[in-house]
Amino acid sequence: MQCPSCQNTDSRVLESRAADGGRSVRRRRECLNCDFRFTTYERVETVPITVIKRDGCRELFNRTKVLHGLSRACDKTGLDAARLETVVENLELQLQQRTAKEVASSEIGELVLKELKQISEVAYIRFASVYRQFRGIDDFVSTLETMNTEQEHLAAVR
């Protein structure tokens, strides 16, 4: 590993531990040339996910875009950035576990909605209104009624 201070490639590992819930290894290193200490992270290389947009064009999955959409939907709901980061990490993990490395943007939207429904109804409605392109109040009412029916069903089952 190249030292960020002197660019020497000889270093020794002082400490290693799991990070990101076991998805990476954090290593504390010391340069053998200048004694500079630095941290590196080792992660499994993932296969890029290709997103098929509504218009048929393809682009690489961009976690920043998903996080931005979540942030807008969750603005002023009390959900912190760490929780949103966890939602995006869970989404990425689900996508990486699939055998197909192409996914429709609609599938990503539905996975995000599924996560949001569990953590914030307000964020769910806000995200759904953009993602599902609500045209008027009837779309909001319909979604709220569906959510209410689902909650009543869950309460009856318990």
Swiss-Prot record:
<keyword id="KW-0678">Repressor</keyword>
<dbReference type="InterPro" id="IPR055173">
    <property type="entry name" value="NrdR-like_N"/>
</dbReference>
<dbReference type="GO" id="GO:0045892">
    <property type="term" value="P:negative regulation of DNA-templated transcription"/>
</dbReference>
<keyword id="KW-0805">Transcription regulation</keyword>
<feature type="domain" description="ATP-cone">
    <location>
        <begin position="49"/>
        <end position="139"/>
    </location>
</feature>
<feature type="zinc finger region">
    <location>
        <begin position="3"/>
        <end position="34"/>
    </location>
</feature>
<keyword id="KW-0479">Metal-binding</keyword>
<dbReference type="Pfam" id="PF22811">
    <property type="entry name" value="Zn_ribbon_NrdR"/>
</dbReference>
<dbReference type="Pfam" id="PF03477">
    <property type="entry name" value="ATP-cone"/>
</dbReference>
<keyword id="KW-0067">ATP-binding</keyword>
<comment type="function">
    <text>Negatively regulates transcription of bacterial ribonucleotide reductase nrd genes and operons by binding to NrdR-boxes.</text>
</comment>
<dbReference type="GO" id="GO:0005524">
    <property type="term" value="F:ATP binding"/>
</dbReference>
<protein>
    <recommendedName>
        <fullName>Transcriptional repressor NrdR</fullName>
    </recommendedName>
</protein>
<keyword id="KW-0547">Nucleotide-binding</keyword>
<comment type="similarity">
    <text>Belongs to the NrdR family.</text>
</comment>
<dbReference type="GO" id="GO:0008270">
    <property type="term" value="F:zinc ion binding"/>
</dbReference>
<keyword id="KW-0238">DNA-binding</keyword>
<dbReference type="InterPro" id="IPR005144">
    <property type="entry name" value="ATP-cone_dom"/>
</dbReference>
<dbReference type="InterPro" id="IPR003796">
    <property type="entry name" value="RNR_NrdR-like"/>
</dbReference>
<keyword id="KW-0862">Zinc</keyword>
<dbReference type="GO" id="GO:0003677">
    <property type="term" value="F:DNA binding"/>
</dbReference>
<keyword id="KW-0863">Zinc-finger</keyword>
<keyword id="KW-0804">Transcription</keyword>
